[in-house]
From Swiss-Prot:
Pathway: Cofactor biosynthesis; NAD(+) biosynthesis; deamido-NAD(+) from nicotinate D-ribonucleotide: step 1/1. Transmembrane segments: none annotated. Coiled coil: none annotated. This is Probable nicotinate-nucleotide adenylyltransferase. It is an enzyme of class 2 (transferase). NCBIfam families: cyt_tran_rel, nicotinate (nicotinamide) nucleotide adenylyltransferase, PRK00071.1-3. Keywords: ATP-binding, NAD, Nucleotide-binding, Nucleotidyltransferase, Pyridine nucleotide biosynthesis, Transferase. It comes from Trichormus variabilis (strain ATCC 29413 / PCC 7937) (Anabaena variabilis). The keyword Transcription regulation does not apply. It catalyses: nicotinate beta-D-ribonucleotide + ATP + H(+) = deamido-NAD(+) + diphosphate. The keyword Nucleus does not apply. SUPFAM superfamilies: Nucleotidylyl transferase (SSF52374). Gene3D superfamilies: HUPs. Belongs to the NadD family.
Amino acid sequence: MQHLAIFGGTFDPIHWGHLLIAEAALQQISIEKVIWVPSLNPPHKKASAFRHRLAMLQLATQDNPAFTVSSVEKNRSGVSYAINTLTDLSVCFPNTHWYWIVGLDTFQTLPRWYRGQELAPMCDWLIAPRLVGGENIAQSELICKQVKQQLRKQSNTIHWHLLHIPLVGVSSSLIRKLYRVGKSIRYLVPEDVRSYIADHKLYSEDSE
């Protein structure tokens, strides 16, 4: 049985923080590959065109053989839901033990996800805390245990692992904001991604 991790998200744009999280998952958990899955229609966000986000992901991950980018959501109609993504990928990759990489804030909302109670036991959850440090790790672990308790009340089990990652104070929303006002995003994103953003005028008033 192979062990694969899904890293789903808007990735608008992908940045070094995302890449560090995926690399930490590879190093700390016995998985063979990380499958990056950009959301076609995120349920709570307005995002740049799917083709741009997919292209930036491909540029950022192309030099790591343990990273692969999936366009499984490309032809999906309606809102992108995690359980549909996992079901579709399970058809493409049978006989797989699945992991799902997710940020702590997002994991905290899992009990409220669409069919979240059904999704929770279908994979192991790899949690990226917002901050790294003694107190923050303890707080992150407490939040994960609270999610587990909420799901247990609904007769569901869940397995989670807290990833240990370097502190990176960067987010996609910060990058978009900086770029929109003409500030540098060099070293916040891979250079190929920065060039792509400039070439396609993303995150500006005349963006494609």
